[in-house]
Amino acid sequence: MIKLECLQDPSPRKRRTKLLGRGPSSGHGKTSGRGHKGDGSRSGYKRRFGYEGGGVPLYRRVPTRGFSHKRFDKCVEEITTQRLNEIFDNGAEVSLEALKERKVIHRETSRVKVILKGALDKKLVWKDAAIVLSEGVKSLIEAV
């Protein structure tokens, strides 16, 4: 028969919390499990992910592989004819600078492609060679 005093809690999450700095017999007295001196013994210290005690970390020991072209790629954005209708007046000049001033495109953008979506009611002047028109937009401009 099981005695009442022999019953154990089945769940390990109700484990007793570690009492720190409560004398040598507790097992966590004096330095409270932090050891002597060094960064880890100081308050507020958090070890950075990947830190290996001052040695060269793994991510620097492993050789790099491949090449990313992301830094050198030209930033291209799309803009619709519908949006151009909202932004520009009739007879206005469309250029990268004009689009950047109106905050339609990002300042790092080097090319823009105009895509046909909705009508283009206004007659616009295309100044920049960096603005590429889709076939649908070209046919729409010729019709106007």
Curated annotation (Swiss-Prot):
Disulfide bonds: none annotated. GO terms for cellular component: cytosolic large ribosomal subunit. GO terms for molecular function: rRNA binding; structural constituent of ribosome. The keyword Repressor does not apply. Part of the 50S ribosomal subunit. NCBIfam families: rplO_bact. This is Large ribosomal subunit protein uL15. It comes from Chlamydia trachomatis serovar L2 (strain ATCC VR-902B / DSM 19102 / 434/Bu).
